[in-house]
Structure formats: C-alpha cells, structure tokens
Regions:
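Residues immediately within or flanking Cys/His clusters that coordinate Zn2+
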Residues: 12-14, 32, 69-73, 91
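Extended, hydrophilic extramembrane loops/domains of integral membrane proteins
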Residues: 305-331
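Charged, low-complexity helical/coil segments in non-catalytic cytosolic or luminal regions
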Residues: 68, 112-313
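Cys/His-rich metal-chelating microdomains
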Residues: 21-23, 41, 81-82, 100
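Short, non-ligating residues that shape and space the ligands of small metal-coordination modules
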Residues: 24-27, 44-45, 85-86, 103-104
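Short metal-binding segments enriched for Cys and/or His
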Residues: 42-55, 64, 102-112
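Short cysteine-rich clusters marking metal-coordination/redox-active sites
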Residues: 17-20, 35-38, 76-79, 94-97
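Juxtamembrane boundary at the C-terminal end of a transmembrane helix
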Residues: 353-362
C-alpha cells in the first residue's frame, strides 16, 4: 500500500454470520447484529450492568507514572479529528469533513479506553427521513436545498467520546442579600412608587454532590450545534462496550484528555455552585463577593455516545448537520435565499403601505 492510498481496513474482526459466513454489523432498528449478505439476525447478549467509577486523583497518578496501552489512531489532515482504526469498515473517510484518511496519517497513542457505550437507537433510513423533513421545513431556504441537495452518502454514524465526572463540593462564601421594598415619592401628578433594595452582609456554606457532569472529548464538533441536541443522552443509559455495538460505525478518539476534561467539568461545577450560593443567600437580589470551594470524591468514567454527522455544500460554504443517535433530534447550519428574503420584505412593505392608506381613508 502506498503512503498516499486511502485506508482499507481489515474486516476480519467483524462477527461472522453463522449462516453464510459474511460479516455482521450492528443495526439500531433491531438492536442486534444483522448479516450484510443474507440478513440473518444475531441478538447481542446483555448481562447485568454495574457502572464503575474511577478515582480521579489515584488514576492520574498512575497514568503519569505507568505505561498505559497504546492504540492505533488516524488523524485527518484537513480538520485534525482523530479516530481509532480498528473499526470493521472497508474504507474510511473523516466523519466531519469527508476527507479520505490515508495510511501515512496512522500513528500510535496512549489511550484510555472507553468502558461504556450508548448504542445507536435510530437507524440510517430514519435519519435520512428526519433530514429531508427538516430541510423541507426551513424558511427562506434556497430552492436547490428544498429539492434535495443532501446525499445520504455523506451520512456518517460516529461514536463520540465523552468523560463523566462526579464530585463533592464544600463552599464557604461571603456576600450580600438584597431585600426589595417600595416607597412613595413625589406629589400630585408626579406621585409614584419606586423600588428600593436593602442590602445586608451574609456569609455561609453550601455543600453539593454533582453526578455525571458530561464533558465531550472531541475538539472537532461544533459545540453550539452539539449542545442543542445533547438532551436525551443519559450517561447512565449505557451498556458495557462490546465490539458488536461498534461494528459499522466510526469511533472517534478523544482530543480532550482526562485532565483537560476535569478542568472543564470543574468550571461547569463552579457555575452551578455559584447559583447554589445565590439560592442559599435568598432575598430578591444577591451579591457574591467571595467563594472558596473544596472538591472531594472526584471520580470519572469514559463513555461513547452516538451521533450522526452529515454535511452538504452550497455556494462556497459547507453546511453541517448533527442528529442525536438516541432521540433522532436534529440541528444544523443552513443557507438563506437572499431573493426570498427580499421578496418577503417587499410583500410586507406593500401590505404596510396598503394598511396605512386604508386607515387614512377611514
């Protein structure tokens, strides 16, 4: 294989069909393995699941000292997304920009393997229908988009890496509580009620436990789009990882490592903790002058969550779609038709002028 040749991945790890020997892949609509040739179905065995949390501090100490397992990953030369290369795919393209991945981009990295996965529950055909309905419902979209510029060939199922963090907080704070009251000012026609706030100094403590603070391990995803469809991903509604669930899909390798993910989770918790302090202060308004937070019992898990990714080109720009692989919820970027917007403005102006003359004559 030349260094510039598109990757052809070995399919020997695919589960062989007991009927014809062909490769079997996971089909979300059946929640089972289905043979690509004869259609035979093999149920995926699911044992009792006990979610295991890892102590963050002790794990980081051992991770920095010991030599952890490495895995082969491939990095896209265009958008720099990374994916593991042990998927049961015949060829591979970047799930985010569709750039072909080549052999020279494969390298080995230390890798904390994910332990749990939320399997795809929405299949490819359902997603194609969801995409077409979404596109048809777009206001002021160019006609070319409405007629179906989207190609199902660009639809890719990706398991996205996530970290979940648990932590206990204990926060001492100083601030002020504001209690509103009203006074009457002025006289005669100028008499009115004005709102005033009486401030008093307060201090206290709050303690909270935060469970499964979710942090994406991807730096390639567009976070504004991802956040809008993340509802429906339950970090506890997962299964122990099995190759069967990953068969036929791309598994992205995390770019946000465990420590960076923890820092992001801590920032998220700090926002929650500030709101907790405000609730504890009470009153109508609050001022928080100082917060001193201690963290304890920090644990984590590494999980995979399902996402469909697609895009289409219009003009000189690429537009991206994301579909939640569990709920089917969709979000995406879209173009606007300048002439449709201009025509709508013109019609609105005509109606406005007509109404002005109508009421003027009346």
């Amino acid at each position: 294989m030349s260094s510039g040749e598109e990757i052809k991945l070995n399919t020997s790890e695919a589960t062989p069909c007991s009927s014809c020997g062909g490769p079997m892949s996971y089909k979300p609509s059946t929640q089972a393995l289905v043979c690509e040739y004869c259609g035979s179905v093999k149920e995926i065995e699911q044992g009792e699941l006990e979610l295991k949390e890892h102590d963050f501090v002790s794990f980081m100490e051992s991770y920095e000292k010991e030599s952890f397992n490495t895995t082969k990953v491939v990095e896209c030369s265009s958008c720099h997304a990374t994916a593991t290369v042990d998927e049961n795919l015949k060829s591979m393209a970047c799930p985010y920009c569709a750039n072909p991945l080549v052999e020279q981009d494969i390298h080995e990295e230390r890798y904390i393997k994910p332990e749990y996965v939320a399997p795809f529950a929405v299949d490819r055909n359902q997603v194609v229908g969801i995409l077409h309905q979404w596109i048809k419902g777009l206001w002021f979209a160019p006609n070319k988009i409405k007629r179906g510029i989207f190609s199902a060939d660009n639809l890719r199922g990706v398991y996205v890496p996530f970290w979940t963090y648990d932590m206990q907080t204990y926060t001492q704070y100083r601030g002020e509580r504001g209690d509103a009251y009203y006074v009457t000012v002025g006289s005669g026609d100028n008499k009115r009620r004005e709102r005033r706030v009486s401030w008093s100094r307060v201090n206290g403590t709050v303690s909270n436990f935060y469970d499964d603070v979710l942090v994406t391990g991807s730096k390639t995803l567009k976070m504004d789009l991802l956040n809008s469809i993340s509802t429906g991903w339950d970090p506890k509604a997962v299964q122990k990882i099995k190759p069967d669930y990953l068969s036929g899909f791309i598994t992205e390798k995390y770019q946000v490592d465990l420590k960076e993910g923890y820092d992001r989770a801590r920032d998220i918790v700090a926002q929650y903790e500030r709101e907790s302090v405000k609730r504890d202060i009470g009153g109508d308004e609050q001022r928080v002058h100082n917060m001193d937070t201690e963290l304890s019992n920090m644990t984590f898990k590494h999980i995979l969550l399902p996402l469909y990714v697609s895009s289409f080109a219009y003009g000189s720009k690429q537009y991206t779609f994301y579909v939640n692989g569990v709920t089917g919820r969709i979000t995406g970027e879209r173009p606007y038709s300048a002439w449709k917007i201009a025509f709508a403005c013109f019609i609105g102006l005509v109606i406005l002028i007509f109404l002005i003359f109508l009421f003027k004559d009346a």
